Structure formats: C-alpha cells, structure tokens
C-alpha cells in the first residue's frame, strides 16, 4: 500500500510539475540540438528534482498533521539528497557544457588529456554524492 501511495503521489506531483515547467524548458538557453538536428530541452531533469521536492513537502505537511503514510524518513532523505544533488550537477553540465566531449568515454578521455569537462565534474560529483549517501545511510541505520 505504501508503494502504491508513493507512486500515485509521485505521478501526480510530477505531472503537475511538468505542466508548469514546459514553457521554461522551451527557453533558448535550455535548448540544444541533438545528433539529428532536432531541438531538445537539456534541463528536463529539473522536472524530477522539483517533483521530488514537491512530494516531499506534501509528505512533510501530512506528517506534521500526525500521519505517517509512507514511513522510512531516512530513506526519503537519501532520495531527496541524491535527486537534488544529481539534478544540480546535471543542470550545471547543461548550462556550462560546451558539448566538446560527450558520454562517459568522452569525459574520461578528456580527463586523461588533462581537461576537466562539466560532464567530468558531474561524474566526480555523482560519485561524491553516492559516497555521502552511503555514509549517511549507514550512520542513520546504526
């Protein structure tokens, strides 16, 4: 039941967030041309970040009223940490990335040649977030 409630809440908040953000995602600064020449929104991950924050805010209000519909506050905090952290790293990559090195292999290749790309920052930042989440989760479980 908790999984179904979480899924429904996430879908509703995500759908509303997407509808609200569609005009923003169409802004030229957030558009790139893909390999087929079609324009794509680069910062679509913002929808996920804002949906998670919105759902978490709604759950916070419900919990403040004395209900605990989902439980597992530590796990939810880790999800928020990972989502916001990866979302921020992705947004920085979208805004600052020059498109010179694409994909995991391209960013590692650039690093091997002494260049740190915005995707490389995302790579190392993601690893740091994963480690922080692991340490936080282990400390909370103890």
Regions found by a protein language model. Give the residues of each.
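"…together with the soluble PPM/PP2C metallo-phosphatase catalytic core" -> "…together
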Residues: 1-142
């Amino acid at each position: 039941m908790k999984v179904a409630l979480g899924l429904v809440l996430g879908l509703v908040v995500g759908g509303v967030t997407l509808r609200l953000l569609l005009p923003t995602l169409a802004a030229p600064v957030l558009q790139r041309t893909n390999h087929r020449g079609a324009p794509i929104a680069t910062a679509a991950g913002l929808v996920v970040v804002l949906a998670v924050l919105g759902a978490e805010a709604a759950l916070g209000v419900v919990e403040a009223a004395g209900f605990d519909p989902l439980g597992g506050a530590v796990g939810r905090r880790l999800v928020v940490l990972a989502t916001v952290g990866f979302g921020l790293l992705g947004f920085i990559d979208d805004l600052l990335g020059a498109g010179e090195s694409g994909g995991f292999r391209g960013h590692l290749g650039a690093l091997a040649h002494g260049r740190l790309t915005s995707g490389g920052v995302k790579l190392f930042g993601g690893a740091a977030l994963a480690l922080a989440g692991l340490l936080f989760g282990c400390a909370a479980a103890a």
